[in-house]
Amino acid sequence: MIEDKGPRVTDYFVVAGLTDTSTLLDQEINRLDTKSTGPKAPITDIAIIIKSAGETVPEGYTCVEATPSALQANLNYGSLKSPELFLCYKRGRDKPPLTDIGVLYEGKERLIPGCEVILATPYGRCANVNNSSTTSQRIFITYRRAPPVRPQNSLAVTDICVIVTSKGETPPHTFCKVDKNLNCGMWGSSVFLCYKKSVPASNAIAYKAGLIFRYPEEDYESFPLSESDVPLFCLPMGATIECWDPETKYPLPVFSTFVLTGSSAKKVYGAAIQFYEPYSRELLSEKQLMHLGLLTPVERKMVSKSINTNKCICLLSHWPFFEAFRKFLMFIYKLSVSGPHPLPIEKHISHFMQNIPFPSPQRPRILVQLSVHDALILSQPVSTPLPLSGANFSTLLMNLGPENCATLLLFVLLESKILLHSLRPAVLTGVAEAVVAMIFPFQWQCPYIPLCPLSLAAVLSAPLPFIVGVDSRYFDLHDPPQDVVCIDLDTNMLYVSDEKKNMNWKQLPKKPCKNLLSTLKKLYPQLSSVHQKTQEGSAIDMTPIEADFSWQKKMTQLEMEIQEAFLRFMASILKGYRTYLRPITEAPSNKATAADSLFDRQGFLKSRDRAYAKFYTLLSKTQIFIRFIEECSFVSDKDTGLAFFDDCIEKLFPDKGTEKTDKVDFDSAEDTRLIELDDSQKSEHTVFIMPPEPPPDDGKDLSPKYSYKYFPRLDLKLFDRPQELKLCFSRHPTGNSITKSPPLMAKRTKQEIKTAHKLAKRCYTNPPQWAKCLFSHCYSLWFICLPAYVRVSHPKVRALQQAYDVLIKMRKTDVDPLDEVCYRVVMQLCGLWGHPVLAVRVLFEMKTARIKPNAITYGYYNKVVLESPWPSSTRSGIFLWTKVRNVVRGLAQFRQPLKKTVQRSQVSSISGGQSDQGYGSKDELIKDDAEIHVPEEQAARELITKTKMQTEEVCDASAIVAKHSQPSPEPHSPTEPPAWGSSIVKVPSGIFDVNSRKSSTGSISNVLFSTQDPVEDAVFGEATNLKKNGDRGEKRQKHFPERSCSFSSESRAGMLLKKSSLDSNSSEMAIMMGADAKILTAALTCPKTSLLHIARTHSFENVSCHLPDSRTCMSESTWNPEHRSSPVPEMLEESQELLEPVVDDVPKTTATVDTYESLLSDSNSNQSRDLKTVSKDLRNKRSSLYGIAKVVQREDVETGLDPLSLLATECTGGKTPDSEDKLFSPVIARNLADEIESYMNLKSPLGSKSSSMELHREENRESGMTTAFIHALERRSSLPLDHGSPAQENPESEKSSPAVSRSKTFTGRFKQQTPSRTHKERSTSLSALVRSSPHGSLGSVVNSLSGLKLDNILSGPKIDVLKSGMKQAATVASKMWVAVASAYSYSDDEEETNRDYSFPAGLEDHILGENISPNTSISGLVPSELTQSNTSLGSSSSSGDVGKLHYPTGEVPFPRGMKGQDFEKSDHGSSQNTSMSSIYQNCAMEVLMSSCSQCRACGALVYDEEIMAGWTADDSNLNTACPFCKSNFLPLLNIEFKDLRGSASFFLKPSTSGDSLQSGSIPLANESLEHKPVSSLAEPDLINFMDFPKHNQIITEETGSAVEPSDEIKRASGDVQTMKISSVPNSLSKRNVSLTRSHSVGGPLQNIDFTQRPFHGISTVSLPNSLQEVVDPLGKRPNPPPVSVPYLSPLVLRKELESLLENEGDQVIHTSSFINQHPIIFWNLVWYFRRLDLPSNLPGLILTSEHCNEGVQLPLSSLSQDSKLVYIQLLWDNINLHQEPREPLYVSWRNFNSEKKSSLLSEEQQETSTLVETIRQSIQHNNVLKPINLLSQQMKPGMKRQRSLYREILFLSLVSLGRENIDIEAFDNEYGIAYNSLSSEILERLQKIDAPPSASVEWCRKCFGAPLI
């Protein structure tokens, strides 16, 4: 067997003919009814006799007495006085026969040359046959005789008859009518002559043909040669031995084609040439000689006649290249009768079969030069969704005419027996193929033999429908059966039995038939003109090749137009049929596949035209219709064709085809082209193939020459051995090379690709549509990668559920799918992994989205439902446990109101907006919008429910309730926005950018700056004044987002600092963390410290389990003013709310809860405790985060919830000026000792989880919740802060929350620390801190604990380290606190503008302050606690990014090790707490990505949404258009890495002291990959700090004053102004040692004395490298070098991705080579998946890639786990590209904010500071004009700028006021109005880049949301 290597032009070369074993054909056909007469001799003479004159029939003649219907055959039939004329004929072989008979109208026509006229009768009378008077014109009969020497196969007249058409007679079968009436008089009937032509029968013996030779000898695997059948089709009339007259010439070869249909309905096309060769007389027996007439019967004398036999050479192929094959076979035949030739025939055959490449789209034409004079062209088959066929519609129409074609269509549709016949065998196959193709989408189901061999003619008697083609000579031997419809292609006639006489085209539905006929009648004349032109002299005007090309082009065009006419007809009669398909929606029964179960036949019939009910009824009962319904209902190889047919119906009848009619805006149906040529068909690209090389001529004439007289016996030795076919030009093999998985699931049909291309072109001109088109393509990318994602996911059900959730998310976010690939892939995966119920849900989701599944999707759906195992019973364990869960949840709901009231009384909280969203948070954000007005209780309830569901454990209900009582998450806060019109600043509690994105008006009323919730206001009032709070919030918000907002310090430390992760919005954080992130966000918003911790924990865990869901939860949460007081509760509430909305949107909502749950579960035993803690933290967070959005930032955190912060607060409480703002009720604090103890237990692998849990339980539930939350936050400390969250939510709260940020993530500042908060809050923070990072956190804790008697508190071996550290720290702490507090308060104040809820700070603080009880009054807590939180220790110092936030003391970042702990849990089975810190700690790599690019032409910075708007609808164009100079350039994605694996924290091993927060590097399975990485990164910072318990320096965070970094550190950090850490050897306790880490910078907070923390490295994702270098004694790994790849439009990326997967299989996505070999596709996918918050395992490839491991490819372990270790931040700006001397305003603001000592600022800095402050205030008052004027005044005329005023003001607003508080749409409106109102003087000073963004840019941002700034 020969292996198949892709498409071949030809498969086999065959020679057939007479063999030694051939049997007589008569034996084969004796069974048939043969005519008794046998073949007749041809007619040699005709005559006219006048019977009325007494003339008789001449001798030897036969008179035609009667017509076929037995009327008198009088040529003047029906005339009154005319003579009776009759026609006589004579047969014989003695002279040449007649070849034609005609009628001559004398005087009107001239006689054709070669014809003779019968002027007289044999008796001399005039032979005028006209019945009119003698005076009128005469009519004579003419004839033409064959020449004496003629070819054997020439036709002759073999029969003659007369018909009277006025009596209804028609020509008999196979007779040709002479279309001239013989009677032209007034009277008489219409009489016509008919005659039949055939090949005169010679003496012959017919045998069954056999195989003489084949090449190659071996069979192909896919198509073995049938050696017995093929020869029959090569010689359908048999292999004959014939005896010819001596003067007979050899006929020219006859070309014929045939089709072999295999059992699988696959067609093989044959092209054959028949010719004659002499046969030796010696080989004949006497019997044969007698039969042939070569031996006289009596004398036995030999007769001198020639003996010949026929032979055939044939090519077999899967492709109908009939014309090319004809030319090649003729070339071979000519070689066989000529010579000499340098090469044998065998060489030419093997060259053609092996060396000719298959035509491909790149090389659509192959010109094969066979010899000097012979060439042929192979053209790529027309690529349409219609089935491939050898149909020749033009031949069909030319031979039958329009009306006969329509009648034939009726017969085929109603499944009649159809017999096609012609004397031209080459015509039969093309016409038969056209007859079968014209009923598309139906497929003929019965016997189909286009050229039937005589030996198979018995099929004509079969009792079932068939389409068969035969040679017309068959009728010389046999009469056709009565019930067969015979179509004579030679005479353009249809012959029908009597019962079908009345069946014709008029029975077809009127309108469709009328349209069909009109089109065919229009095309009919064009066909004849094309044929005439090509015959007439085209060869004279152009070369044969050119003539060939042009003729082929015209014919192809006509072919398609004819085929399209039939396609329109079929679409018209079947329109709307999909409505009547019945999907299987339950476990299938035996009758599920019956046609009546699958299709509503009665409904379909009722919807059709009643006048044609009979036609439709008959049609619906045919096999073709029933099969069509089955193919529509199940997967079949016809699916692409059926989908194309559905598209045709939709184009022609937009109202009937689908419900989704908005896509159809085509021209009128008449003009719509249904079949379109590929571009490749129009291509002139031709490959030239030379003939085989002759042997070298060395002049000695030794090389043999080949000369032939007849066709030789071929010698296999002379053939070239079959090589592998050269597929250099060929397309990829049709068989998929993909192993294991089914062929590319997400593959689009060609039609879908074309439709998407058209749609994109149409959308391109419409800004909203263009943005949605890009958005939709991005979702498609995710679904294309889904099969691979599911394959590496465990369990599969969760991955499938995630996919389903994404589908719901798409619908809810108004994504208009470009095709059905998304749904189809999910359905196929449901089948692959056996989840039919989910497939049913997907189908109903399609219906909900008003999308009608096309044939492909519907087929896969039914296949899945039919073949997959259905669950046996609803009473499964899952079902029963679900019932239990519902009962428990119901009980919890009843308890909520009670707890809420308690909480409210206890807590006064600031409401926070959502913190940054998790990976999948966008959806949630949007949802939040809707939920903004949901009451807090409801939100809380939802949150609780979800949380419970996810954990599947009953968490402390009270804690949850507390959460609920907290202010509802940000989303809700917008309810209270002021009534100002289009205000830029939203309500503080407003969500991030998402909310505004979803609807600029929404509840926000398009406010530029949102107002706070009433609750928020109250809280703010408590805190101090709104203004202060706002500032704080701003600062705080800054922190979290800032952290990862910028690229690394290496590239530009300053940039990084500014963009540090802290800057990143909480939403970013959320994005990274998944659902947990959202929770974190909320937490941040509340008391920053505890929230931070909480958030961290939450997001990581949630992320791991259910990224999307958890995220959703977060976003959706609302803040309730009442609840704001307790940060933790708020957070929980928020998450709940988020969850619920998400749930509506997508199951992912549940995921949020799950995430939350998973966080808890991450630390297995810790789960319950953590959960409690989380809820508490959430509450706290909420309060502290004024807007959840700000939660992540801890800028405002004055008093952290973490133990350190609390301690600090206690110590410095009174000292902080802002402390009043931050009064936290002491209730929040928990028992510090308990917390620490439990925390330690958690961390240590040996510690008993239960004990730690008990400790938590002992504390009030709220505290427990807080603690958990805090942990989460801790984890998150490294997460970026939400930009939005900071200032936007509530200025006041921001200010108040200035507590020290613990981690970079939490850059909250706590301006004032609330004494009341001190004790308990601190303890909370401490415990949280400890949990997250036993060592590092502890250190910070110690600092804050200065006031506590740690000896008493701490006991047991685990606490030894903590004790010693704390003692030392305590002494220093009080002093440090003062400094730190002051610094913080300063930054807090700035931040106040931002608002407490700045995500980062709040979140971290919360995390740290796990102990804080939810009840604690959060108003105070927010600012101070956040500031205090130790977690954010390193954040403020680390980088400017953190911005102004100093988290000197409180910021001790939790080492990422926390995350490691989670890993450890899974690895070592120890239950570690899953606090945010741990999440951060588990982060091994932070990846910062920005699409901001620089235009090559004008140098301007072009941002993401501008790049999107500049892309074109061309899926091959990589360029975008610069919005300013309109030039094209290639945008780039810039990627930077912060490798945190070298940090000790990441690799911490569990230690006896329980400090091993950084337990393994392996995340828990339940943690979501993406989130984890983020958190772990941040965490390590915090944790590092735990190594040196003494170094709690940053604890000062709580105090409110920041420690000044030492000069060395300042130098080291470069622009990182926030970093004010001095590396203190052992005295970490020194205040100056505070570390700030900026997410974007990427350095660790290692300013702390590393000597003391040998095993935890602080890994700060965004810390500046310089910082890392200075601080990291461990010798952290160098960061991998940055990467830049082209930023591809989703259209281009999709095309490339599909091509890649088709060539390499979809498993390539999750192989280690993907990132190395396809970096462009990889990074673009990572960018888009992250952009849309879609779960993905791709980030896991980053960790093991060569690039990130110094050129060594590490083995892949667990993608899902590794992905959790990578935190990806998408940055809006790229400071590395900034080339202006002045730094961006938002960077300046961050820097001023972080260093809050105005006395230290230079004069220039002071001016800038004033400018920035003025702009901020203007924006708050909705005034954009003033900032434009101020900035324009500062511009130097004529100096080219990169940064536009628009970006300067917008970015400053987002960073300083909090991203969640800015309505970007409102800002755009205000900016546009202000710009248009500028005076011409100012406009002259402005540049093009300062113009407002275009509508297209705005829509792209609205669709995709804004990245982090």
Curated annotation (Swiss-Prot):
Entry-linked Gene3D superfamilies: 2.100.10.50, 3.40.50.11500, Tetratricopeptide repeat domain
The chain positions of domain dDENN read: 523-641
GO molecular function, a single term: guanyl-nucleotide exchange factor activity
Q: Where is the sequence biased in composition, kind Low complexity?
A: 1426-1440
Q: Which residues are recorded as modified (Phosphothreonine)? A: T975
Location of this chain's protein in the cell: Cytoplasmic vesicle membrane; Cell membrane; Cytoplasm, Cytosol
uDENN domain location is 191-364
PPR repeat positions in this chain?
821-855
SMART domains for the chain: dDENN (SM00801), DENN (SM00799), uDENN (SM00800)
Annotated protein name in UniProt: DENN domain-containing protein 4C
